[in-house]
Amino acid sequence: MSPRSADPGVRMALLETAARIIATEGLGKLTLRRLAHEVGTSTMAIYTHFGGMTELRREIRREGFARLGARQAAVDTTGDPIADLCVLGWAYYRNAIENPNLYQAMFMDGPIDEADAGVGLDTFGQLVTTVQRGIGSGRLDPADPVGLATQLWALIHGLVTLELARLLSPDQVRACLDDGARNLITAFGDDPRAFGRSLTRATDRSSRPAIRAKPVSAVDIAGSSSYRG
């Protein structure tokens, strides 16, 4: 089977199955034979599609960031950059929850090497650009746009990771996303009342995950003995 005749369905099955093995069992459990067996193909198919396991693992990361980038790119740019920041955060959350194995595998396979140094920069750049629009609108402190974007990314990534590990429930995470964004964005200069109005506008847009529970406090989290999904 030549690269030209390679089946894209098999390629995606290899990527998603490899991501599941890495995410649920660890990188050490991913082998050529096991992957080929679970997908129902030959080990040669892995070489046909990826050239080997090293490139397959790189493609998992690239595919994960490609899906994240597409999800974020679908977020409309409006006249309210703070609302846009909130919707970008929810888009990140939804992408991770809908692609849990791929998302976890993206960050479990060690540091990004020089060959993939640019992977993920586009998705982070979308966040930085939106923060810069907030600065341009006069609502955010102009001192450190990259710093705010980094802290927002860390907030969302950390909460998503806790949910995927079943240490926090979806409702707890969704409430903390809003509270954490409020705390960070107002700390970087936004007026709390203006943020509240932006959050309301963002809530009216379709990307927001529903929150059914009241916001969770540190006492609630400490008192929860286990996740109840």
Task: Please give the residue ranges for each predicted region.
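Amphipathic alpha-helical packing segments from all-alpha helical-bundle domains
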Residues: 95, 112-137, 146-151, 175-186
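Amphipathic C-terminal alpha-helical segment
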Residues: 98, 133, 153-171, 185-197
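N-terminal intrinsically disordered/low-complexity leader segments
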Residues: 1-9, 192-229
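Hydrophobic alpha-helical connector segments
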Residues: 73-102, 124, 149-152
